[in-house]
């Protein structure tokens, strides 16, 4: 077996399939939203008393961070996503495939990051469509990629606590 095949079989790189699934699901949902929903608040679909589907453009990062800037943030966030994707992929190549928790976390972040980079490169903005609210307060709209990134980051944080508990 070649060295590259062994790396793929025995290391966390094997979990990159999950990043691909997250990426494909993210761009697939965004395509459906763009093709089937009208843009903006007036075209929202009220699903639950605290949740709407809503097609909006986000020129910033997760939860509209820096969306009011002049456009430089598109390139900043794209660069950050490439660096993070490279680092996480490298770390996955050093982790055993059996270490599922961190590999899944890294793959989710990679898939989400690539999904949002795809939007920035193709559209010049990120498509957001999930709108949660309480009363009149609305959390900034977000998408599957943002969700995957946040869940992956939360898993990494939780892993830090798990390891400290195991050491005691």
Swiss-Prot record:
Q: Which reaction does it catalyse?
A: Release of signal peptides from bacterial membrane prolipoproteins. Hydrolyzes -Xaa-Yaa-Zaa-|-(S,diacylglyceryl)Cys-, in which Xaa is hydrophobic (preferably Leu), and Yaa (Ala or Ser) and Zaa (Gly or Ala) have small, neutral side chains
Q: Which PANTHER family match?
A: LIPOPROTEIN SIGNAL PEPTIDASE
Question: Pathway it acts in?
Answer: Protein modification; lipoprotein biosynthesis (signal peptide cleavage)
Bilayer-crossing residues are: 15-35, 47-67, 75-95, 107-127, 141-161
**What are the EC numbers?**
3.4.23.36
Residues making up the signal peptide according to the UniProt record: none
Q: Tell me the PROSITE patterns matching this sequence.
A: SPASE_II
Catalytic site positions: 128, 146
What this protein is called in its record is Lipoprotein signal peptidase
Localization (cell) = Cell inner membrane
**Alphabetical list of InterPro entries matching this protein:** Peptidase_A8
Q: Which UniProt keywords apply?
A: Aspartyl protease, Cell inner membrane, Cell membrane, Hydrolase, Membrane, Protease, Transmembrane, Transmembrane helix
């Amino acid at each position: 077996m070649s060295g590259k095949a062994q790396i793929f079989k025995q290391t966390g790189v094997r979990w990159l399939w999950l990043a691909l699934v997250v990426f494909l699901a993210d761009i697939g949902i965004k395509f459906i939203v763009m093709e089937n929903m009208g843009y903006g608040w007036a075209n929202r679909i009220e699903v639950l008393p605290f949740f709407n589907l809503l097609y909006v453009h986000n020129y910033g990062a997760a939860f509209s961070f820096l969306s009011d800037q002049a456009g430089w943030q598109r390139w900043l966030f794209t660069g950050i996503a490439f660096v993070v994707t490279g680092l996480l992929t490298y770390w996955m190549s050093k982790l055993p495939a059996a270490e599922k928790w961190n590999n899944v976390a890294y793959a989710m972040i990679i898939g989400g990051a690539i999904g949002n980079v795809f939007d920035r490169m193709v559209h010049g903005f990120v498509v957001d469509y999930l709108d949660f609210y309480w009363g009149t307060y609305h959390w900034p709209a977000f998408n599957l990629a943002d969700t995957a990134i946040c869940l992956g980051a939360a898993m990494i944080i939780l892993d830090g606590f798990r390891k400290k508990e195991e050491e005691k």
